[in-house]
Amino acid sequence: MPENNELLLLFFQEVLPFASKLKKELAEYLKLKIRIKVMLKLPPAKRRGQQKLASDFLPILLTLSQSAGCQLGLGIIADDLYVPALNFVFGLASPRIKMAIVSYCRFLSTNEEVTFKRLLTECVHELGHLFNLPYCQNSHCVMFFLIH
């Protein structure tokens, strides 16, 4: 990983019970310094039914990351996300601006540890894109494209 990268971990609307654990795991695995912030009010986003357009969250994430002095941003949101070409997405990353967003609405389980592991895996996947990692054909790799 490039050195001196700092990540803003932005929770939209709520902080999950395992936010500290997520921060710790990401920091250890990716060797990043991480700051946590909460944005209680969602920014406006285009809608398709109950879903929200994933890319609409990246500009506000960029603004907040820059104001916090962070080079990378990762948003966590409960709302279901989409991009025009797909029915839904678990997350979206923009390597150009080093921002990503992950939705956990499709990861929810009655077992909190299962939910956490799913969220952590998707966060690492999207952050991998920020470091220009491509999709992988190996289904055991975190960069595997899940819709295959």
Q: Which residues make up each language-model segment?
A:
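Fold-level signature of zinc-dependent metallopeptidase catalytic domains
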Residues: 4-14
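Metzincin-family zinc-dependent endopeptidase catalytic domain
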Residues: 15-123, 130, 134
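Post-HEXXH active-site segment of zinc metalloproteases
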Residues: 134-148
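Short strand-loop junctions, especially beta-strand C-caps/beta-turns
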Residues: 10-12, 105-107, 146-148
